[in-house]
Amino acid sequence: GLRTGHPGFTSWVTTAPSTTAAAGHLASAVAFPQRYWFQPGNHLDAMAVRWLIELLGFPASFVGTFTSGGSTANIVGMGAARQHAAEQLGIDAALDGMGAIPEPRVYASSETHHVVTRAMGVLGLGRANLRLVELDDGRRADLRRLQAFIHEDQSAGRTPVAIVGNAGDVNTGIVDPLPEMAAIAREHDIWFHVDGAYGGWGVLDERVEAAFGDRSLYDSFAVDPHKWLAAPVGTGLTICRDGDLLGRAFSIESGAYLRERSRAMPVEDAESPWGVIGGTMDWGVDFSMPTRGLPVWAVLKEIGAEGMRERVRRHNDFARMVAARARAEEELELLSEPQLSIACFRYRPPGWDDEARLEGLNAGILSELRRVGRSLPSSTNVGGRFALRACYINPRNDHEHVKLLVDDVLEIGRRLAAEA
């Protein structure tokens, strides 16, 4: 098999860290960071958060906290949603629990990542209370169905807690209708959380930025620097409009030796390490944690905002190159039009119409690709059809290996089809 950092590896939405990020990770470990009082790590975390908030197009008034990844980043955002819904009913969910909230409901598309389901269980919202919205013809959350769910639940006395939008699902990279979902959330005063763990970086490609809408209308946003930014795995980020609400949702009572409560760092102190007392340890799940902002800071210092924009555009172009080949080759079938950096296609010889037979053929192609070891996509299911899925997120991906993947699929597919 291929290493995750190989230019032909396109299986996952995570990748090996860049050299600079790995060096930053090592420096973070050696520095033995603490999240309390005047720590250089808190300063670097704060700087990196402010840079990412600006880079991703959020207002300066928004706050952020690093997490261990997308799972925890979504839990933090959903925890804020839970606190918001409870406080509208005069309840402190963090203090008194969920028992007094009548039948909480959360709405998300059927392509929502399972980490949202996990958050429902961890936060006591209940996995059974996640309303999965069917997809429209563009494989996005169906807005009419979303509205119908909300009206049905409100009429029955249930409590809408959050609407969750997908900023690029991990199967096909399709972005939900986020501007319209934000408007629906505002109409009903429901928290709008966006899972952009993989695809949130897509806002940096001006060709698709409009699909993400006005980020000032988001209430919380999860994004993973350990994906497109190529930071070390274990680096997530939650961005939120209300730091005080995060504090009420996640604050703890300090031990006697930490009686001076940590405070959230004001925006104006972001360039001064002496303004940092405790950083953001009351804004999330972790208490002790590494300085995750140091590798992020190092990568951004190395490639800059324009370098990151160029990376996202390049990877999106790679997915479009695969799609163009799939449309041009008689033996290939494009199964999902790329919006971001994921291309889903399959080998389909002329005259082959049986889905079970096509699935077996393409599964065989994938196995042979793994054996040959030059290109390694993954597989997924698109509308009931087995697909070869190439996800371009690795900074080492290049044009040569984009072409090589399609060439290998054609060569192997022809051989296996002839043997069938």
Regions found by a protein language model. Name each.
Residues G1-S61, V276, S367-S375, F386, ...:
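N-terminal entrance/gating region of PLP-dependent enzymes' catalytic architecture
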Residues S28-Y36, P59-T65, A100-E103, R127-L135, ...:
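Glycine- and acidic
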Residues P40, A73-A249:
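Conserved PLP-enzyme active-site core in the AAT-like
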Residues L52-A80, R131-E134:
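Short loop-beta-helix segment that forms the pyridoxal 5′-phosphate
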Residues E111-H113, D137-G138, G168-V170, G199, ...:
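Short, glycine-/Ser/Thr-/acidic-enriched flexible segments
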Residues D169, G213-E330:
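Active-site C-terminal subdomain of aminotransferase-like
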Residues E333-P338, P377-V382:
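Short beta-strand
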Residues L334-L369:
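Conserved PLP-binding catalytic core of the aspartate aminotransferase-like
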